[in-house]
Each structure stands twice: as C-alpha cells, then as structure tokens.
Amino acid sequence: MFHILSIVNIIWLLLALCFGAAFCLNKFSVKLPNRVEHVFQDFIRYGKTKENIKRASWQLVFDLSKRYFYHFYVVSVMWNGLLLLFSIRSVVMSEAFPDWIIDVLGSLTGRSRGAWNEIHLSTLLLQVLLWVHTLRRLLECLFVSVFSDGVINVVQYAFGLSYYIILGLTVLCTNDSLPQSESVSFFNQLTWYHVVGTLLFFWASFLQHQSLSLLAKMRTDSSGKVETLAHKMPCGGWFELVSCPHYLAELLIYAAMCVCCGCASLTWWMVVLYVLCNQALAAQLCHEYYRSKFKTYPHHRKAFIPFVL
C-alpha cells in the first residue's frame, strides 16, 4: 500500500488529474468568469492555439518564444545522459549510485538504499530509450521543425525544464517495482517484451519524425528554404486520420516503454496516464484551431486517436 502511495506515483497521478480536468473544463470554460477563463486558457494553450484568445496585457509579460522548446531537450540529454552513465557504471563496474541520487530516489519511493543495488535490464533499457528519444527531439527542434512566432508562458517553460529531470528520476524509481533477478545474469534477463517494446518504440518514433517533417515541409520549398511561417492545413501520412499524429506517437512511445518493463511498473503506468491526458488536451486544442481556421477541414478527422478521439 505504501508503495502505491509513494510520492513519485502521487506526483504523476496529480499531473494526470490536472490535465484530465483541464481537458474536461475546456469545453465549459465559457461559463467561467471572464478573468478566470482568460487565465485558464492562457495556461493550457501555447503556440498557434493562443492566437485567438483574449489575454490581458499583464499576461503578455510572461510570454516566451516557442522556439525555446529545444531547451527542454538540452536539459534532458544532459541530465538523463548523466543518470544513464551512473547506471552503466553500476552494471559494468558494480559501482554504487551517488548518495544524493539514492537519497532522492528513496524519498520518492519510500524504499531503502538496497532497492538500487541491482539495476534491472528493463530499467537500463528505459533509460537508453528515453535518452535516444530526447536526443532525436533535440535534433528535430534544431534542424527539422520550422517554428512560427508562437509563444509559451513562463510557467509552461519552467514545467518543461523540470519535466525531464523528474522523468529521468522516475525511470530509476521503476527499478524497485520490477522483479529482482540476482540469480540471473544481467543480459540473460532479456525477454520477449524487451524486443516488442523496443520495436514499438522505434516505429512510434518514426511516426513522430515523419509527422513533424510533414509539418515542416508545409513551410519550406523543395530546397528546404523557409517560405512562410503561416499555419496551413496539414495533410498526408497519419494526418489523414488525426489532426495531431505526433501527439499520438508521443503516447505510443511512452506505451512502448511500458511494454519494455513488462507492463509491471505501476509508476510507469502513472506516467503513461499523464501523457495520455496531456497530449489529449494539446491535440484537442489544435484540432479546434484547425477546424475553426479551415472551412474545408475533413469532418472525419479526429484530434488524437483514430476513429475515437
């Protein structure tokens, strides 16, 4: 019971509930007092979805360029690369984690220091996949995506910076919920769900990259030179099914990582639930934007999940 109510699980559950509540409240926010609605909409929207909402002049002071998204991935590549290095040294050299990391993990999970004496193959695999994912996203932000003049607010920026720090620690927190295998050598822990999860991860990553590339191509010519920063109606690939296949791919990436730990970690299920709520909200706002901007927008196209949402 204490493990279920650990701080790390509560953090992700609360985040999921907050974004899930925001998703539901968005449909009825017009009934809120004007000042409350304006603040609410400002906090849940970013980029193009902020364009047509009413915002007080004081709110504009807290705007930052959406181009700063790459900062999140710089932090992640460095931080999660460091945690990955500690794990590799633990597996290869039987070197203990630094005391400060063990103390943080113990506070998040309520477990003793011994929970990280042995790093499970699933945990190390999750760390590798997370690092690969954020490295790819960093490279896409720098060399593929063409950002408009859209903005995010400073609270969203601060959340984005801290998100991957917490996520990296969360991956290590999953280690204590996985079955320990002292009698089985590290690489003999390899099983079918590691293979299936990794294959799903790379397929979802390809889907996300393809979708982001299609969005970028709508603003560039055949030589790759930027022609416009205007928002156009997306088409091609999975855009024929949903408005935001890159958000769907994000969910699939986290689901694939859940498969990699045999779907046995309650903590990672909480993360997947958060990603579902977060990406569903972002996708719904984009979907509403496209439908309001383009009169010929396909009626059959869903926001996030084909034929469902």
Curated annotation (Swiss-Prot):
User: What is the membrane topology noted in the UniProt record heading this document?
Assistant: Multi-pass membrane protein
- GO MF term (any one): oxidoreductase activity, acting on the CH-CH group of donors, NAD or NADP as acceptor
Q: Which UniProt keywords apply?
A: Endoplasmic reticulum, Lipid metabolism, Membrane, NADP, Oxidoreductase, Transmembrane, Transmembrane helix
Q: Where are the transmembrane segments?
A: 4-24, 68-88, 115-135, 151-171, 186-206, 256-276
Q: What is its main location?
A: endoplasmic reticulum
Q: Which InterPro entries match?
A: 3-oxo-5_a-steroid_4-DH_C (IPR001104), Dfg10/SRD5A3 (IPR039698)
Q: What is this protein called?
A: Polyprenal reductase
Organism for this UniProt entry: Danio rerio
Name of the encoding gene = srd5a3
